[in-house]
Amino acid sequence: VAPGWQELEEAVARCTRCELYRTRTRPVLGVGDRHAQWLIVGEAPGAEEDRRGEPFVGAAGQLLDAMLQAIGLARGRNVYIANILKSRPPGNRDPAPAEVAACLPYLERQIELLRPRLILAVGRIAMQNLLGTDSSLGRMRGQVHEFGGLKTPLIVTYHPAYLLRKPEDKRKAWEDLKFARSVFARLA
């Protein structure tokens, strides 16, 4: 029998696959509806997420919630939110390749358990690691990509933290969200 959510939570809680376990306060597995049809994947926990053990709880999380609400979704209601990394990189630096390699199997297991109908990758780090590309986020926007053996549709948009720094790109993110919503509607 394949391990389920409880086994995954326990494995992440005791994980020592990379050095980030030494500096984290709490690992951040994910949050939301475990029968969700939408999976939102970000980069890594920040300081507030590390303290609370939940992804997207700071200002970027508030913006993500507003973005989801704009397309008729809500955290915890048909939405599950996770990150590439389950532990916070010091100083919120980009994840190192070895850290991603250590953590990605956990996300892949989450995806197996969830079996989402659509994945929304927010930010360059999530997009590049889920799609195995070094392309820019701008080049990958506006297309339906496929993830994994189940060929789950994957849409790319900007990370909410980036949008807080560059609000002029919110219009592009809105276009991405409307595109994701229309792709999802066609899956029904």
Where in the sequence are the language-model features?
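A polyanion-binding, active-site-adjacent surface
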Residues: 1-188
